[in-house]
């Protein structure tokens, strides 16, 4: 392709609304154009990158035995209501675009396709002989993001590969899950990315287990905790660890003490000259289920620890059937305004004890009359601890479970693991932190969707059983931008060779020099004919402008038909290393073929 004929406009300055380097560079280099909030056009260079990423994804999925299909973007609300996710996705998380057609039927623009694929399986799979079955698609998805940001990282529409597998049992599912683990690792390796698979929370998708594939980058939205021995890595939402041991309490007798102005852990530790590890902290939450029922939750945790709200939400979701509900709409620490909607009398905030009376909750049929009390494992073994006295300005010291306070029945792990904690698999290993961009996620769904939608098969004994499912997603457009986030410098993008829009760019320093033009034209034609995808910068611009643009767009190899042609050579500059070599013109094709092959094979 000739740059003189391409829709190609670069910017010298960073766009004002771009926050992270990859977003700035893709806009500046003319790869994408913002059309609206979270909505981008993929321009010719970007489309080539996306096609290359998609091809790698296709090859790995096909090699794993999956079959490509294409599912509808418009999805009837009835399917989502069958699975119980319509309210979750249109009210709670609020990420599904929904609309009403001329027949007054509700529809959703698909952010994901579990319901659709399960409905197809329900209609078409009858026997164990048809299993296992694995289908996938590459398609534009939609999410009504509250705050679209970071370009293609968190847009309102994006390209995604989503796959779904069906099985007779968990063993079959686990095999495909492992196949996908390997396939996803292959995809990212082939794309030239540094990545880390991590244990993850399944979120609204559900299921028994999941793994995220994180591209490591400082601008990543996710925190990953890992150990140096390579045996543990997890998203911070899912991570587990061993906290530091609690310090022994200096309070050996139970006593109520006046502690004015000590509503926070920091203030009470200073006032009592105690360690936060000696304190039982009581954190109040308010959760609203999808049937409108409000439940007040008291999380009892060691004073130096923080509540992991993802873990807490998972525990509360397990309790949803107790309140006639399926999912959580909202989980918050209630504001003073929210408290007024359910309190019968003023709460002693900052001084709450584990046994705060249920009488604080006003009588209301939409409000559960009792606190749900979770005690985190970090608080269970504390002795002679400090905690609130249920009276403003007072704490108690020297308290014990089973004496002054009953130990709540529900013992959970809802603490937030953090760097510096000891690893559970080996207490000599210390958790470290890195930032990552989630570009892939694989799930073991089990029978969540098949049971909800009645998708069954007949086994060898003639019994009807629910299909066991897995699902597997790769953000194609996000992966492409994450490659930029991981590899750039002050001058522009440094594309991995495998997904670069072109392998090489031939730059003519002086468009008025007939010899430069002639050699450039010949190399451009012969390189493309030999399989080296090549751009020709034949614009009537100064050489400095052309060199800057070549660096900005990040093409791996720049061929310059400058002074060296008088010696029968051209200059080739490698974008990643900036190393420059003069190569005989007749050897350019074989040299580049070898370099490109070596660069791609190194990642395979």
Curated annotation (Swiss-Prot):
Highest taxon of the lineage: Bacteria
Subcellular location: Cytoplasm
Assigned keywords, A-Z: Aminoacyl-tRNA synthetase, ATP-binding, Cytoplasm, Ligase, Nucleotide-binding, Protein biosynthesis
Pfam families attached to this UniProt entry: HGTP_anticodon, tRNA-synt_2b, tRNA_edit
Catalytic activity: tRNA(Pro) + L-proline + ATP = L-prolyl-tRNA(Pro) + AMP + diphosphate
GO molecular function ontology, one term from the record: aminoacyl-tRNA deacylase activity
GO biological process, one term: prolyl-tRNA aminoacylation
Subunit annotation: Homodimer.
Family in the record: Belongs to the class-II aminoacyl-tRNA synthetase family. ProS type 1 subfamily.
Function: Catalyzes the attachment of proline to tRNA(Pro) in a two-step reaction: proline is first activated by ATP to form Pro-AMP and then transferred to the acceptor end of tRNA(Pro). As ProRS can inadvertently accommodate and process non-cognate amino acids such as alanine and cysteine, to avoid such errors it has two additional distinct editing activities against alanine. One activity is designated as 'pretransfer' editing and involves the tRNA(Pro)-independent hydrolysis of activated Ala-AMP.
HAMAP family: Pro_tRNA_synth_type1
Domain statement: Consists of three domains: the N-terminal catalytic domain, the editing domain and the C-terminal anticodon-binding domain.
Protein name: Proline--tRNA ligase
Organism: Trichormus variabilis (strain ATCC 29413 / PCC 7937)
